[in-house]
Amino acid sequence: MAFLMKKKKFKFQTTFTLEELTAVPFVNGVLFCKVRLLDGGDFVSLSSREEVQENCVRWRKRFTFVCKMSANPATGLLDPCIFRVSVRKELKGGKAYSKLGFTDLNLAEFAGSGSTVRCCLLEGYDTKNTRQDNSILKVTIGMFLLSGDPCFKTPPSTAKSISIPGQDSSLQLTCKGGGTSSGGSSSTNSLTGSRPPKTRPTILGSGLPEEPDQSLSSPEEVFHSGHSRNSSYASQQSKLSGYSTEHSRSSSLSDLTHRRNTSTSSSASGGLSMAVEGPEGMEREHRPSEKPPRPPEKPPRPPRPLHLSDRSFRRKKDSVESHPTWVDDTRIDADDIVEKIMQSQDFTDGSNTEDSNLRLFVSRDGSTTLSGIQLGNRVSSGVYEPVVIESH
């Protein structure tokens, strides 16, 4: 029975990509990395030498190698396989280097998981001046099984989940996928342990919630009871456009909504009873007739609601016009001033007392003057002489 205790052997094709090193506390410098397998092989390699730019170094270097692992035959748990990445800095023009830090990765955690991205903090070789506690190394690891039993177990991951500030854990979805049938919803509720969703009351065209009919016990009875229009076209459009509920109520008052009245007397007599609700809440019952009733016509499409900015501007304008401010009370009205000036003026015809035309007078010394009938006495005394200008 000794062969049963022999460990299982595995071979994995490993693809290791050295992405970048961030939060480097150097403004300039040349960094490179040395990667090697501590367990499961003798792979050793060096990355390219890159300069520090904006406290970050990007290599984008890809390494491919074969990694050997073993597992416990009883549990199938893979044994640790350590892969070390050492970050180093060039000194003396590349002739020497200094070790900045390293990180150890257990490749057994990534076995058979495809491509995985991991960010690691660098660990310092000593505690003096070469520790880079805040530098973060980003790598990508992909492992594919080449040989061995495909049934194995990976050790628990050592990665730490970082919670984002301001994100509520209750916002995460508890279940994926959702069926529309009642069976799917009941199974989902039983798995998640949540209460079944409550049935919301139907909103009528008048904006009032309609209570569910107690006389209809099964979905077949609800389906065969007839046509029922719960909401008007305007209310449906307002829900799609995000319009307010108050406007949908007021706009749907003009539409008449028909609802099947399933009373005990009508179901017993076998007749068809229709209840019509108007804006005032009045109901009129139509007596059963021999001819089957025609389906109600589709109401005309209501006008398209205004844009939100137009509505707010109109509401603001109406409020300003209806409510005068203290500036309007203290300001002098220009129309009142113009009206007072017009009333104080005399616009009667005064041509009977004054001469409508002006005349030019020249005196003996050469002085001139313009006047009407006021200079008549001076003209008669010979002080001024009238001048007559004739057109040539």
From Swiss-Prot:
Residues 129-138 are annotated as: Required for interaction with TNFRSF11A/RANK. Residues 183-194, 262-273 have a biased composition (Low complexity). Keywords: Cytoplasm, Membrane, Nucleus. The keyword Membrane applies. It is found in: Nucleus; Cytoplasm; Membrane raft. Residues 173-324 are annotated as: Disordered. Signal peptide: none annotated. Disruption phenotype: No effect on bone mass under homeostatic conditions, however reduces osteoclast number, amount of bone destruction, number of osteolytic cavities and abundance of serum Acp5/TRAP levels in a lipopolysaccharide-induced bone destruction model. Key component of TNFSF11/RANKL- and TNF-induced osteoclastogenesis pathways, thereby mediates bone resorption in pathological bone loss conditions. Required for TNFSF11/RANKL-induced osteoclastogenesis via its interaction with TNFRSF11A/RANK, thereby facilitates the downsteam transcription of NFATC1 and activation of PLCG2. Facilitates recruitment of the transcriptional repressor PRDM1/BLIMP1 to the promoter of the anti-osteoclastogenesis gene IRF8, thereby resulting in transcription of osteoclast differentiation factors. May play a role in estrogen action. Belongs to the EEIG family. This is Early estrogen-induced gene 1 protein. The gene is Eeig1.
